[in-house]
């Protein structure tokens, strides 16, 4: 072992430790910042998914409610179709359950020969 071995080893050790310390001064804050951002990403992803599920829950409930209200509104509109008569018929095979059977009134027929020609000519003159 030469007399320069110990000082050379000490120099390399001190140089290595000082470079490692300086590198850790730069790297550790970035690692910490990266850890915080990745944790926030995971947390916000969970919150986003949860809020989406809550919104979807309310959306589904309100769609069902609004469909019922729209059907009620449609039922209140006057119909352009002939009136339908409903009669209840007991089902033969299913006991007490009642089924609704709809009958449509006979459609009215208007033949071309029954329309007076004067009314057609008047309607053409009125439109001009």
Curated annotation (Swiss-Prot):
<dbReference type="GO" id="GO:0016020">
    <property type="term" value="C:membrane"/>
</dbReference>
<dbReference type="Pfam" id="PF17062">
    <property type="entry name" value="Osw5"/>
</dbReference>
<feature type="topological domain" description="Cytoplasmic">
    <location>
        <begin position="1"/>
        <end position="8"/>
    </location>
</feature>
<feature type="transmembrane region" description="Helical">
    <location>
        <begin position="9"/>
        <end position="28"/>
    </location>
</feature>
<feature type="topological domain" description="Extracellular">
    <location>
        <begin position="29"/>
        <end position="34"/>
    </location>
</feature>
<keyword id="KW-0472">Membrane</keyword>
<feature type="transmembrane region" description="Helical">
    <location>
        <begin position="35"/>
        <end position="59"/>
    </location>
</feature>
<dbReference type="InterPro" id="IPR031430">
    <property type="entry name" value="Osw5"/>
</dbReference>
<keyword id="KW-0749">Sporulation</keyword>
<protein>
    <recommendedName>
        <fullName>Outer spore wall protein 5</fullName>
    </recommendedName>
</protein>
<dbReference type="GO" id="GO:0030435">
    <property type="term" value="P:sporulation resulting in formation of a cellular spore"/>
</dbReference>
<comment type="similarity">
    <text>Belongs to the OSW5 family.</text>
</comment>
<keyword id="KW-0812">Transmembrane</keyword>
<feature type="topological domain" description="Cytoplasmic">
    <location>
        <begin position="60"/>
        <end position="128"/>
    </location>
</feature>
<comment type="function">
    <text>Involved in spore wall assembly.</text>
</comment>
<keyword id="KW-1133">Transmembrane helix</keyword>
